[in-house]
Structures are given as structure tokens and as C-alpha cells.
Amino acid sequence: MKQYLDLVRDVIDNGTLQGNRTGIRTISLPGAMLRFDLQKGFPAITTRKLAFKSAIGEMVGFLRGVKNAGEFRELGCKVWDQNANENAQWLANPFRQGHDDLGEIYGVQWRQWPGYKRIPLSNPAAIEMAEQAGFRRIAQDEEDGVAFVILYKAIDQVRQCLDTIANDPGSRRILFHGWNCAQLDEMALPPCHLLYQFHPNVETREISLTLYIRSNDLGLGTPFNLTEGAALLSLFGRLTGYTPRWFTYFIGDAHVYENHLDMLNEQLKREPLEAPKLVISDRVPAFAETGKYEPEWLEKIEPSDFWLEGYEHHAPMTAPMAV
């Protein structure tokens, strides 16, 4: 993971010290990119121990549409505890529904994006088309003398992506995101890793992923998000019969928190070790072997279905999370 260390050094050397909502200043640098060939190994940090099971637990929670810190804990991931129960802004938010509630975060938008259509009653063909696509009427009103109907559908963006990879792999529209402007105030934390675009290559039978992250804490967030993105790409490849290949990782605001500097400067002194290999349990069906498309495994997957083979790392290190 020399790329990761190079980025940390670049941000520390060339970034600007800035204030932010957390009260802990960051050294920030706009615009960064990392790119990994998953055929050469899994992008796990080795200059300290990676919290692999916690990261995978979070990814599984997202795929299940989890919106409660307690459910994340059951999956082996405790990183949402503070945002759920110690974030002053969220604690005062009327959308918060009690202890451990996180609101309409990542997985809710991924798997149950609230889609609405406002169609004039004078356009019955459009209403019929929407209803055939699974939208249902929930209200009717009138504005400026024009009567209209409101239709609603919970949209499973992740499933749509997987289906498109299986049925229309030449599409350049295979993406999902979590930036729902209408519900940002209903979330304990708006999405940082917010747009995932998949690129299946029918000629090579390889699949790649481009991930855009609006804001990335290099000390704690980046190792987690790299793990989740690479594991998700590998899972998508397994369920659709493609070999995972290129994982490209874009960051809008790459930053280092002041209270992470000691940890990161120590890591910069350590020599990165060989990349491990990701293994997915034989319990998870491989389309390349069965020829059977089984998208229900998006929900059936468990954290124990993923592990790293040949993972060696330097001594563990910790740093506080800014909330």
C-alpha cells in the first residue's frame, strides 16, 4: 500500500490546516486518486493492523439497509456508535428516533431510495408507465389549476446495478449513490463514500469499480473505505461471473486530522508489506462455476464469508474518531 503512504505524505506536505464542524483541525488537500489492480492483491494497509472484520461488517450492514448502530454492532462493527449517540447535532435532530438510530444513511439510500413522480392527471400514459415500473399512487392534488398525482417507489439501486451487469454489461450507467439532497437532514452523517460506478468488460470478463468519496479521513476512513470498495467489487464479480480488476478511488477532500499526525507519521516510517489476497467463502455461489444468477446473496452475505489470506502487518495503532 505504498500508494496510500504516498498520499498521506502528499497531504501532510502540501495540504492546508483548516477548521471544520468537528472542532478538530485537519490538514486538507483537494483532489486525490488511488488506483489498484485487484489481480495483484487486496488493498489492505500493512503499516498497521487493518480492522478488516469491522469494515466488512459495515459493508454487510449497508447491503442490508441497516440504519441502527446496534445492528452494526451485531455485525462486528462499532464505528457508528458515536455518530448515533454522541453527535450533538444529531442528538438535537427531531428526525432521530431514539438510542442507536442513524436515520436514512448509506444503506437505506442504496437499497430503498425513496423515488417520487409528480405527473399531471392529463397524462394518463405517463401514469400508466410509472405504475408498470412499480410506482404506486399515494396522493393527488392541484396547483395553479393543474391536477396531478404523486406516485412512490422504493428503488433498490444496488440490485439494479447487479441486474444490469448480468443483463446489459455494455451499459455505462451502472452506478448507485447515497447523496439524497431531500434527506440529508435525516441522517446522522451524510455519505462520504457516495458514488459507486461499475465497469464490466465482456471481452476480458473483468469488472472494475470507480468510487468517488467527497470527504476522506486518511487516518481512519481511507483504510476502511478501500476495504469495503474492493470487497464489494469482488462480491459483484463473484455473483455475475466477472474477475475483479481495477479499483479506482477518487477523493474530493483528502485530509488528515491533527490528532492523527503521530499515528500517521509513525506509519510513514514503516515499510509496507506484501498485499494479501481476499477470499470469499465457498458458501457464496460463484456464477462462473454455477451459471446461475443469484442476486439474493446481496442480503444473505455474512461478515464471516470474507477473510484475508497471507495478511502480514506491523504493530496495531489507534487514533480517536472525530464526530
UniProtKB/Swiss-Prot annotation:
GO BP term, pick one: dTMP biosynthetic process
Residues involved in (6R)-5,10-methylene-5,6,7,8-tetrahydrofolate binding: D217, A322
Keyword annotations of the record: Cytoplasm, Methyltransferase, Nucleotide biosynthesis, Transferase
Q: Which domain of life is it from?
A: Bacteria
Binding-site list for dUMP: R21, R172, R173, R214, S215, N216, D217, N225, H255, V256, Y257
Q: What class of enzyme is it?
A: transferase
**Mind telling me which CDD domains this protein's record contains?**
TS_Pyrimidine_HMase
Cleaved signal peptide residues: none
Question: Where is it located?
Answer: Cytoplasm
Q: What is annotated as the active site?
A: C192
Q: Which reaction does it catalyse?
A: dUMP + (6R)-5,10-methylene-5,6,7,8-tetrahydrofolate = 7,8-dihydrofolate + dTMP
Q: In which pathway does it act?
A: Pyrimidine metabolism; dTTP biosynthesis
The protein's GO terms of the molecular function aspect are: thymidylate synthase activity
Q: Per its UniProt record, what InterPro entries does this chain match? A: Thymidate_synth/dCMP_Mease, Thymidate_synth/dCMP_Mease_dom, Thymidate_synth/dCMP_Mease_sf, Thymidylate_synthase
GO cellular component term, pick one:
cytosol
Q: What does this protein do?
A: Catalyzes the reductive methylation of 2'-deoxyuridine-5'-monophosphate (dUMP) to 2'-deoxythymidine-5'-monophosphate (dTMP) while utilizing 5,10-methylenetetrahydrofolate (mTHF) as the methyl donor and reductant in the reaction, yielding dihydrofolate (DHF) as a by-product. This enzymatic reaction provides an intracellular de novo source of dTMP, an essential precursor for DNA biosynthesis.
Q: How does it assemble?
A: Homodimer.
Q: Which HAMAP family match?
A: Thymidy_synth_bact
Q: What family is this? A: Belongs to the thymidylate synthase family. Bacterial-type ThyA subfamily.
What this protein is called in its record is Thymidylate synthase
